[in-house]
């Protein structure tokens, strides 16, 4: 037994060492944790991210402006850290906010323009990441572009984007009054029972100072201001065409107020960017950072006035010309001293006093930034934008957008830089005229563009759509023929031509073009193939060919299961047979499919309403006609059906209202002619003649006016 004593002694010694090391480790960890927590505690108070639309940094006193009308922002800046060189990744509202709220560049999140793009549901937003850490999340936004359909509402438990509907002949609002947005944000703050919340507010530059002042006051009222982290940032610089990538467009204010004004009065001179916001805010609350973020946390420079950031070139892009008419996209990389810009030409812009050539100079910087941009773009792909919904066309036109040529986009022109800039401006002006319902003037503006630059297939396509709207069908067919000549590989051109031929009653030729579109669409997006088969099904219905209509309807559904063309076609066939109950059942099924997938289909609610009307279910029929007009505000037949329903129900005041709505929504020769014809049918010949007189004055010289008047008297 004595021989075991040394072993027991050794084991006791080892155990003592292990226990001692354990306590040393625990104590060390506690000490490190205490030191780290003391030096850099997690922000426990509320977080406010206030985005200001179109406010250049140079207009604020904290950025050197001598005269300002932003006292609240100026006061906040004195309690904050100011970033002197903060940059956006896009001179456009939606792409810049997508980067701001995801920490991803436009090529990564996929939102490349303001029209036809939305943030994918698979993308994780800052709101989602904070909500998973126990934050209550809310948002109030002013811009139409940031409504929930943009995808930016992901992760927000509360997202207020309600824009009041226009009244009478008013144009639809592109944003709501800033006071309404601030009201919504204040109400949300008042309802919070704790301080761990994240609030995002987007406001136009005109309302920015009021927003900062009122929200700061609301936090103070609830004793949350001192502990709050407030980030004020611009979405982009000066508003314009979305083309410029210079400092006036890309440089934005960035002001960060930390709890208890930590670091107040300091300035950070290193270049920073929108995609730094997500990792910074996550770091401030000690939340884990997800993989795939290209930005970096700015906490080091927030905590330490001596800290500096390593240079990291900042990416920006503009696809304004590319998506609007096939022009050349623009890209930029901003470094410490230079910005490299690539568009029609390439340019190196000095941002600071030039570097001595012995230290590298312009040629070295240009080569470095050019190579870095090449690497970034090498793996970047660009999807074509989705079509603008009919209900949104007027708003987007007022923002300078017409429906994009729905084809895999490619640069279609060799315009030089001056010509491209002038074309962007001319195209934007044409779109705004159309948004103002000055259709004839808008058509003339588009015609001037294609006279100057004939190869622009996208503009011919947009011109054809506007001519068709005005009832100038033969001219529309010519425009779409030109699209087919310029882009014979594009299914969209054949589809548009088929539609115009249908309007002209030339169904045989329409069927031929629909078949061409189907053949071309086999090599494109499945949505295009579905649209081609849907067009073929509609042509077959007009030709009373139920077999072909059914076959194409099934093919459309195979290409896109969210498109209930089979139910629509079955409903149409049953309706034509007078089986209104069965037809209504098919239309109801189609309606449910669209509701599930969030789509729309022209004439679905119209025929659903017609079926219900013939079953004497007038209130339900009225609701369907209104649904049609909500999705397709210029559907003349829906106005006609609604007016006749009101007449049958002895609702004469409603008849007058709906005919006034018709003329307001479709101020075209067709709209006036249909309204005049309906007044004639209703025995109001004087009112009909008054409308015709107004039309002659408004559309004097319009080629379609005489034909419309002749049709209206039949």
Positions of predicted regions on the chain:
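Structural marker of alpha-solenoid helical repeat scaffolds
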Residues: 452, 486, 520-524, 559, ...
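Terminal, low-structured helical/coil segments at or just beyond the last alpha-helical repeat
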Residues: 657, 669, 674-714
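Catalytic domains that recognize anionic headgroups
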Residues: 2-499, 503-508, 512, 523, ...
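Canonical positions in the second alpha-helix
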Residues: 448-449, 482-483, 516-517, 555-556, ...
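TPR/TPR-like alpha-solenoid helical repeat scaffolds
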Residues: 527-535, 600-607, 611, 643-648, ...
């Amino acid at each position: 037994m004595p021989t075991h004593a040394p072993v027991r002694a050794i084991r006791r010694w080892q155990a003592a060492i292990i226990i001692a090391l354990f306590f040393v480790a625990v104590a060390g960890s506690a000490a490190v944790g205490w030191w780290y927590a003391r030096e850099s505690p997690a922000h426990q108070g509320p977080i406010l991210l206030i985005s200001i639309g179109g406010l250049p940094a140079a207009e604020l006193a904290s950025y050197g402006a001598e005269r300002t009308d932003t006292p609240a922002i100026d006061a906040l800046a004195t309690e904050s850290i100011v970033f002197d060189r903060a940059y956006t990744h896009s001179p456009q509202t939606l792409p810049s906010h997508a980067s701001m709220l995801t920490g991803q560049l436009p090529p990564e999140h996929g939102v490349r323009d303001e029209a036809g793009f939305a943030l994918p549901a698979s993308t994780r937003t800052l709101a989602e990441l904070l909500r998973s850490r126990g934050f209550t999340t809310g948002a109030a936004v002013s811009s139409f572009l940031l409504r929930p359909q943009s995808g930016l509402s992901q992760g927000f438990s509360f997202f207020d984007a309600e824009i009041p509907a226009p009244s009478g002949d008013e144009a639809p609002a592109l944003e709501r009054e800033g006071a309404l947005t601030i009201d919504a944000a204040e109400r949300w703050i008042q309802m919070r029972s704790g301080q761990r919340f994240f609030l995002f507010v987007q406001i136009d530059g005109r309302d920015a100072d009021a927003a900062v002042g009122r929200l700061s006051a609301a936090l103070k009222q609830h004793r949350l201001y001192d502990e709050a982290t407030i980030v004020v940032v611009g979405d982009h610089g000066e508003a314009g065409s979305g083309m410029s990538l210079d400092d006036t467009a890309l440089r934005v204010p960035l002001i960060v107020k930390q709890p208890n004004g930590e670091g107040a009065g300091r300035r950070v001179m290193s270049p920073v960017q929108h995609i730094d916001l997500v990792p910074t805010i996550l770091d401030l609350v000690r939340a884990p950072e997800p993989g795939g973020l290209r930005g970096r946390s700015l906490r080091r420079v927030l905590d330490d006035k001596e800290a500096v950031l390593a240079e990291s070139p900042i990416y920006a892009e503009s696809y304004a010309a590319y998506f609007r008419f096939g022009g050349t996209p623009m890209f930029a990389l901003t470094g410490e001293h230079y910005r490299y810009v690539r568009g029609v030409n390439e340019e190196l812009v000095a941002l600071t006093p030039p570097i001595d050539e012995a230290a590298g100079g312009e040629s070295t910087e240009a080569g470095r930034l050019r190579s870095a941009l090449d690497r970034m773009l090498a793996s970047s792909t660009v999807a074509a934008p989705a079509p603008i919904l009919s209900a949104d066309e007027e708003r987007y036109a007022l923002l300078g957008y017409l429906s994009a040529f729905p084809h895999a986009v490619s640069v279609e022109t060799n315009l030089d830089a001056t010509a491209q800039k002038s074309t962007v401006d001319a195209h934007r002006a044409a779109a705004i005229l159309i948004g103002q319902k000055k259709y004839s003037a808008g058509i003339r503006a588009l015609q001037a563009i294609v006279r100057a630059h004939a190869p622009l297939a996208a503009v011919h396509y947009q011109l054809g759509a506007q001519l068709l709207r005005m009832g100038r069908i033969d001219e529309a067919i010519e425009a779409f023929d030109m699209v087919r000549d310029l882009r014979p590989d594009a299914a969209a051109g054949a589809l548009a031509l088929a539609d115009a031929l249908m309007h002209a009653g030339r169904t045989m030729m329409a069927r031929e073009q629909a078949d061409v579109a189907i053949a071309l669409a086999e090599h494109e997006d499945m949505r295009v193939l579905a649209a081609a088969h849907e067009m073929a099904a509609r042509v077959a219905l007009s030709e009373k060919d139920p077999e072909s209509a059914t076959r194409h309807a099934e093919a459309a559904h195979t290409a896109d299961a969210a498109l209930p063309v089979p139910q629509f076609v079955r409903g149409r066939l049953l309706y034509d047979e007078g089986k209104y109950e069965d037809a209504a059942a098919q239309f109801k099924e189609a309606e449910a499919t669209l509701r599930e997938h969030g789509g729309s289909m022209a004439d679905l609610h119209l025929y659903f309403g017609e079926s219900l009307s013939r079953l004497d279910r007038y209130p339900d029929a009225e609701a369907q006609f209104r649904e049609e007009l909500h999705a397709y505000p210029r559907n003349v037949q829906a106005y006609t059906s609604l007016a006749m329903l009101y007449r049958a129900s002895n609702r004469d005041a409603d008849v007058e209202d709906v005919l006034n709505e018709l003329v307001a929504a479709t101020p075209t020769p067709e709209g006036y002619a249909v309204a005049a014809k309906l007044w004639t049918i209703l025995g109001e010949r004087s009112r009909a003649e008054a409308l015709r007189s107004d039309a002659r004055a408004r559309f004097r010289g319009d080629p379609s006016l005489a034909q419309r008047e002749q049709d209206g008297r039949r």
